[in-house]
Amino acid sequence: MTELKADVRNGIDYKVADLSLADFGRKEIRLAEHEMPGLMALRREYHDVQPLKGARISGSLHMTVQTAVLIETLVSLGAEVRWASCNIFSTQDHAAAAVVVGPNGTPEEPKGVSVFAWKGETLEEYWWAAEQMLTWDGEPANMILDDGGDATMMVLRGAQYEKAGVVPPAEDDDPAEWKVFLGVLRERFEQDKTKWTKIAESVKGVTEETTTGVLRLYQFAAAGELAFPAINVNDSVTKSKFDNKYGTRHSLIDGINRGTDVLIGGKKVLICGYGDVGKGCAESLAGQGARVSVTEIDPINALQALMDGFDVRTVEEAIGEADIVITATGNKDIITLDHMKAMKNQAILGNIGHFDNEIDMAALERSGAKKINIKPQVDQWIFDDGKSIIVLSEGRLLNLGNATGHPSFVMSNSFSNQVIAQIELWTKNDEYDNEVYRLAKHLDEKVARIHVEALGGTLTKLSKDQAEYIGVDVEGPYKPEHYRY
């Protein structure tokens, strides 16, 4: 691989596809700002206070137009920011360029934020970009904003290996990405044996966006390896019940349509997983007229699927009949090579969980099947018997690889939670131990209230007597922490 080097212009280091795309990106950012009332309200509320002044935020999250609005909100509240994408295919190159240039800069004289992201990165490029995002001139990063946990893992594993005095060798059967990750840490260790330890000691907290990253945080905490407090943004109601369900409901069919242009109506579809994301998948495809079946390990979710009108089957029972198969579990090895070989000729296979190991892409690549690239992020894999399947985005997030991800309004909910969580950990750090927390209910309700008003809804107001009768304050919060929405 050619050695990667950041570009530097007007004192800003960056690596994006093409800075000349910035004008297009800025136009889309302005449109997105109108559709992101939560972030814009937070800018108005906190701009004069500058609650993030002094924060050096390293962000690892899909570099989209919507994320650009998040980044510029953090900056407007006083933070310094460096950014990389958390997925090799999810970057929107015009958005990345616009963030580097900034609202008041030009491609010749950028005045924005350091971004290291472009669509179609290799694994080596991805982890190089992640390291650049975490590497600051002078003082190290002191906050992390994460999606999937890669930035957090890089800091914590790097510090762990520095303490041990060695980066372990990769095993032959390790995933390709893990081998690359260890290689990057090993190369850095040879040059600087304290880099990650210094960052881990400097970081005051991390806010995590998605289910997969939250699972990693809880695993680090259980092992006593979490070196700083964490806020689980994913399980805020205004994130998980909106982004995960309604966002997916919009973006899944967008990705399938852009990737394949097949008619969804009448097709047999198998959705693996019926959590919030799976529910959004099933609802959107059923709304297009597809005949949907669901796989589940959890009897409660399975019962929900049945009551919603979907068959519940195993992968083995349904795989041979499905025209479209979508994984949405957050687990690994959901679709194996044997499953892929059992699929119908030219069936479509895609994933909308965070990582690419829900579908065993490594086994497919080793199988001897012939890969034919149809167009970016659409590949036909032909098996020895002549049968083929269509795989979207190489088993990674198809809604971001084949389309542009969730729409701005629903991301305004999620990203408002991220901003509030960053402010919470930065300004009240002494109140948090090295554990995983959730945002307080009244903050969740605050985010919801902003978006209700933006959609023209009018909330009913409790009287004092009514509030006392059900044991809540007139201004909320209105539900206990254990309430399930």
Swiss-Prot record:
Annotated protein name in UniProt: Adenosylhomocysteinase
Comment on bound cofactor: Binds 1 NAD(+) per subunit.
Reactions it catalyzes: S-adenosyl-L-homocysteine + H2O = L-homocysteine + adenosine
Cited HAMAP family: AdoHcyase
E.C. code: 3.13.2.1
Subcellular location, principal: cytoplasm
Function: May play a key role in the regulation of the intracellular concentration of adenosylhomocysteine.
Subunit description: Homotetramer.
